[in-house]
Amino acid sequence: MKIIYQEQQNECGICVIGMLANAIHDEKYVHDELLEQINLPPNGLSLFEMESYGKKFGLEINSYQLTFQELKELDSKFIIVHFKDHFVIVKNKHENSWEVYDPAKGKYLLTDEKLEKLWTGYAATVAKAFKEIPPVNKSNFFSNFFDFNLVTFYVFIELIIIGISTLLATASRTIITNTVDFGTAVNLVVLVVYFSCLKGLNLLLQVILQLIRNFLFWKQYRGYLGWIIQSLQQKSFVYFSNKSPNQLIERQFYLKEVLSFFNFYIPNLIISCVVALIIGVLIGINQLEFLLIAIAQIVVNAGLFCYDFFFTKKITKKEIPYVELQNKISLQLDENLREEQNKKRFNFLMLNFRKALLQNQNINNQKEINRLTIENIKSFFQQGFDFAILGLGVIGIIEQRYQLSFLFYVFGIQSLFSTYATRIVQFGAAINIYHYCREKLVNLFIETKKDEGIKVNWQCPDEISLENLSVTLNQHVDLANLSLKIKNETVIFGQNGSGKSTFLKILTGRGFEYTGNIKFNNVDLKRCSKEQLFENVYYLKGQNLMQTEANDFGFSEALFNNQNPHIYQLLFDAGVQNQTKLSSGQKQILQLFLLSNIKNKVILLDECMNAIAPEIKNRVYQLLVKPLTLNNFVVLVEHDLSFASEAQNKINLTNYLRNS
């Protein structure tokens, strides 16, 4: 553990927090940074304040008043110990020796006797916890994701590589000048060996740089991804109810692009500006025509790059809908082949699938043709510029304006100049992508919709009352001015399209607009927060049977808590103990069984018994549904009412339909 030394007597607490954060989270806090982040009282931090600030730095600090023997028995890697007006960190290194990290004196050892004399009887254990995530927005986005030290390191490494390349180009001029009189064969050997070594060294340096970059990039990426996932764990239910899982997963792509912008494009811009300026001046001083060729090469490369960028952007916009359609139809085909046998629907899906595949293939062909065309055009112009430089060089040598060595020198630095100058243009496209990805990442941290409800004291209702409830079911049929009193264990039934499922979904408080009032006892449904309703109102749909094994959703725990042998017999008779593959009826029995330990909730069952065999349906109702009504408020929607002879109340929703 590295010591952070205090500069004032009251700073020991913040230094201790900083040292622990650095050791546990591999952070790099320094003294001045800690002073900025912690509001330091004149008398220093107390143990209670250290507990509070510890959460900000990802530390779970719990303080105690102990005997010395209890201190020795504490199971914690690091322990904060309070001396008189001072805090230190200790580790029990040996049986009678303590390793002390003191922000005032540094690192030293204390025996049990000496530590006991200095100790005041107060200590705190330290454990790793989630760091508090500050709100991320556009104004602080740069400071949260930009690592100045890392960018400086990248620039430094690449400058070394460029310096070596420039020195080698300069050395080539000297070597050729000094060997020009040795004869043609010697010159040829020198040039071949020299340029082979030059190219090999340059490639080696580039590979080393890329390996270092990749290692540091992925280390940084994993850290930021963990930071984002940690921040998501602090979000409310409302946040997740307004964001699909795909929105959260795709942020990994945006994170990569943002980090690439900071760690690749910004260093490249800095390097490119420096190199283009210095080498451009060097070329211009030696020979203006070579500078003009380099500028022409930059213009052509920039034009080709811009065309490729905008073409790819345009074609990708066309591609996305067809890719989404292809994925959607793939899922439907999978369902058709696994869950049903419908040749007519299969042919229809295959027809649309082929159309989507053909469109995607055409788009991919266009992208590939564009890529090859750009590469060939770029190669053609590169060859043309090389011949132009060579031609000018030969003419210059014939006219004795400069020597052969100068031509090789210009070849080297002119190529370097055009390469790095073109990167400046590429930076413009990177900015475009960065702004888009930044917007997406910022939106990840923002809860755009607030929970407008008010958290009331939840109590399982004895009655749900509807007062002048009106809701449109479709264009012409609705429930208008519906006033009802719904009791526990009520069964809702009615003709198809009478709004039974819609009626239950309205009671969840999510997804449907209605007028009038819905009250749980005397509490209006609209006064409850979405998070509260999600926690206390269960809506189960009989057709939504995603679980395929009895192990799903805590089957073993439910079995352990069950005290009724008749339920064990029911599960055995229904074959639910066969955990490899369940039928629809078995899944419904499992679904109801897993509710058996729920209490003080509103449970809405939407045809959750329609697939259960008629001979055991009444047993299922008596053993799994009816017990739920003892500790919960249960409303059912069913077509088959043979089991519901004992239900307290039945409501035929067909009688309340109105044609508009």
From Swiss-Prot:
It is a multi-pass membrane protein. Signal peptide: none annotated. The chain crosses the membrane at residues 150-170, 188-208, 265-285, 290-310, 379-399, 402-422. GO terms for biological process: proteolysis. Residues 6-126 form the Peptidase C39 domain. Keywords: ATP-binding, Cell membrane, Hydrolase, Membrane, Nucleotide-binding, Protease, Thiol protease, Transmembrane, Transmembrane helix, Transport. The active site is at C12. Disulfide bonds: none annotated. ATP binds at G494, Q495, N496, G497, S498, G499, K500, S501. Residues 464-657 form the ABC transporter domain. GO terms for cellular component: plasma membrane. One of its GO terms (molecular function) is cysteine-type peptidase activity. It is found in: Cell membrane. InterPro entries: ABC1_TM_sf, ABC_transporter-like_ATP-bd, P-loop_NTPase, Peptidase_C39. Its main location: membrane. Belongs to the ABC transporter superfamily. PANTHER family: SKFA PEPTIDE EXPORT ATP-BINDING PROTEIN SKFE (PTHR43158:SF2). This is Putative ABC transporter ATP-binding MG390. It comes from Mycoplasma genitalium (strain ATCC 33530 / DSM 19775 / NCTC 10195 / G37).
